[in-house]
Amino acid sequence: MAKKIAAQFRLLLPAGKATPAPPVGPALGQRGVNIMEFIKRFNAATASMGDVLVPVDVTVFADKSFTFEVRTPPASFLLKKAAKVEKGSGEPNKVTVGKVTRAQVEEIAKQKMKDLNTEDLEAAVRIIEGTARSMGIQVVD
């Protein structure tokens, strides 16, 4: 029989560098999860990812055990890194903060494919282009 799920939540953490400080400690502690066990397992699973922020879906069961699934970094994070900008535009339709090439967008789309709701690369590229547009990052050929 399957375990009873007590809680499900998502955290955005630096790969390989999770600590008991917020947001990890409070999110896990209030649900009775062993914080240090989570940190050790998460850091081991993401150590090879480098310096990126990764979303992690945590499922806590009624017996206080847990599982987690590491997802791909957010498209906005990857776009900011590719465009070499600190943050997106406050007025995306008026002010552009950076540029990315179509090849960079395709690379990001390939990396994000498993988390996007499409199997088609061209559709994935359009999704990433839309994210870039909403951040004030221009896509050039």
UniProtKB/Swiss-Prot annotation:
It comes from Coprothermobacter proteolyticus (strain ATCC 35245 / DSM 5265 / OCM 4 / BT). Keywords: Methylation, Ribonucleoprotein, Ribosomal protein, RNA-binding, rRNA-binding. NCBIfam families: L11_bact. The keyword Ribosomal protein applies. This is Large ribosomal subunit protein uL11. One or more lysine residues are methylated. One of its GO terms (cellular component) is cytosolic large ribosomal subunit. Belongs to the universal ribosomal protein uL11 family. CDD domains: Ribosomal_L11. InterPro entries: Ribosomal_uL11 (IPR000911), Ribosomal_uL11_bac-typ (IPR006519), Ribosomal_uL11_C (IPR020783), Ribosomal_uL11_C_sf (IPR036769), Ribosomal_uL11_CS (IPR020785), Ribosomal_uL11_N (IPR020784), Ribosomal_uL11_N_sf (IPR036796). The keyword Transit peptide does not apply.
